[in-house]
Amino acid sequence: IWPMYGREMKDHNWRKGGYGMLTLAQTLWYSSNIGVSRIIDDHYRNNPEKFVKGIYRTGLHDDLKIPLVGATPARIRMPHRNKNGQYDNWAKTSLPWMSIGYETQVPPISTLTFYNTIANNGKMMRPRFVSKVMKNGETIMEFPPEVMRQQIAKEKSIKELQTILEQEIGRASC
């Protein structure tokens, strides 16, 4: 349990004593709420707009244009300052809680698209469910691959994320 602005941040295993000190990679492997929220809060608490703009740059909030009823793009709130320089739509807990998925609305397909983008060396592809529609052996409609963003982050950052995710897969399968 970690106190944050009058609230308690917990990991799923808090009743068993939690994880203790973690590296960045371990924080991601274990999906530690405390670790992620502390890292993000430490680095962005004085400039939460920078954090949200960084998320926007990855395309996580992009409209995937999924042709299904009810499909909507992710909603990730940008903090706004009033004329006095105070945030009018933001609390001290907003950033740490947003960093672990609260205070946002991110459909699973957006999360999957993000992970696919990391696996695809940073190139974001529009999700598609079929490549073509055929009738009587004839192709009547095609859905070619569509690039949404050529590169969502620096190549070095993508490679580091790939390494962490590959290590997690290896760790989890042992």
Predicted regions and their residues:
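Beta-lactam-recognizing serine transpeptidase/beta-lactamase-like catalytic domain environment
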Residues: 1-173
